């Protein structure tokens, strides 16, 4: 559809990591198809993908312009750290908080460009793009008509009864979670929280932000969680701006089948394995999965390496019943798949379940344990509770999923639930509601006539 001058403009933002920006781009693709004009702020590694969905591109600068493969350069000592909570704390401080000024400056550059139209601009960001926070806290500069935040991760907002790891509501668990809730803000993330407040003050905010994990949930005009309710633990209280929106929309893409596509179509059973786009070593999951299933009768294993041009190490022998490809359209393969073995990314779970495919999860970093616990509680997954599973663990888990119809039945229920939520429609309704209420439109402070500078010690990456 041609762009419409009657629609509000969209400014979308996301961290330059695949799991964060790709869900945003999926929705932006739908918006541009429906006649919206969109601009996207993210890292240069994703510029072509931004343009491919019909949006204009504004790059992040400086330390904010990282990507999946340069994180170790941004966070001191990261490459030597095993996946752990300590590494997550470091990631938050250096990747999300320290880069906030550069993110905010990029948003302001984009707003300045869009302001000439005189049309309302709606800000759409993902939950960990902290550069949107100062806009809700009185910082000088251009202001959007309103802010919509997208939940591209399991819910991070605290509750008396859940920390995102289980649904235990016993008195003992309740007391433990209350203590952990306090520790998250006042001990574990105390440094990041203090730096977050300091940066916001330096940028001219007239209010202090909420706890770093929760500000986006509370301050956004609309918060759209990109999953169905069954993939979240129950909560006693959620903000009034919160809504479950289902998974991101599917888009038709050109599909050129590989030479072995006939093997997929004729196989009695197909198992897909991938480590996503941020694999450190294919020997962590893909190689042991190929080994685990090499003697399975009537089974074809398809391994997707996640990056164009990627290859398995030279010493890996690919079994006869396996096919390996560098990059592949998931939506083309998943309708033929009986089970997915993967490392627990949030988007991968939604993608798989949108085709009613149950999963085996082997992931222990970032948000992957939270994803796995939700998937297992929903009955659609087996959580191996490790990022380095053995051949025996993988074989047993795949056999269990294939041999027990309850996993496919539960996956089908979630698929139907996903289909009852139209995330693009929900987003467009939210955009139009915000624009029609004219929440400040595109305004700026009296003194703000030039680009917002990136200033202050917040730019320094401390060790």
Swiss-Prot record:
Under catalytic activity, the entry for this protein gives: 18-hydroxy-(9Z)-octadecenoate + UDP-alpha-D-glucose = (9Z)-18-hydroxyoctadec-9-enoate 18-O-beta-D-glucoside + UDP + H(+); 17-hydroxy-(9Z)-octadecenoate + UDP-alpha-D-glucose = (9Z)-17-hydroxyoctadec-9-enoate 17-O-beta-D-glucoside + UDP + H(+)
What the record says about family reads:
Belongs to the UDP-glycosyltransferase family.
Protein known as? UDP-glucosyltransferase A1
Q: Which Pfam families match?
A: EryCIII-like_C
Organism source for this protein? Answer: Starmerella bombicola
What PANTHER family does the entry give?
GLYCOSYLTRANSFERASE (PTHR21015:SF22), UDP-N-ACETYLGLUCOSAMINE--N-ACETYLMURAMYL-(PENTAPEPTIDE) PYROPHOSPHORYL-UNDECAPRENOL N-ACETYLGLUCOSAMINE TRANSFERASE 1 (PTHR21015)
Molecular function via GO:
hexosyltransferase activity; UDP-glycosyltransferase activity
What triggers production of this protein?
Induced in early stationary phase (at protein level).
Could you tell me what this protein does?
A: Catalyzes the first glycosylation step of sophorolipid biosynthesis, the coupling of glucose to a hydroxylated fatty acid to give rise to a glucolipid. Can glycosylate all hydroxyl fatty acids generated by cytochrome P450 monooxygenases CYP52M1, CYP52N1 and CYP52E3 into their corresponding glucolipids. Main products are 17-O- and 18-O-(beta-D-glucopyranosyl)-octadecenoic acids.
Q: Gene3D superfamilies given for it?
A: Glycogen Phosphorylase B (3.40.50.2000)
Q: Which residues form a coiled coil?
A: none
Keyword list (alphabetical) reads:
Glycosyltransferase, Transferase
Could you tell me which InterPro entries the record lists for this protein?
Answer: EryCIII-like_C, UDP_glucos_trans
> What's the EC number here?
2.4.1.-
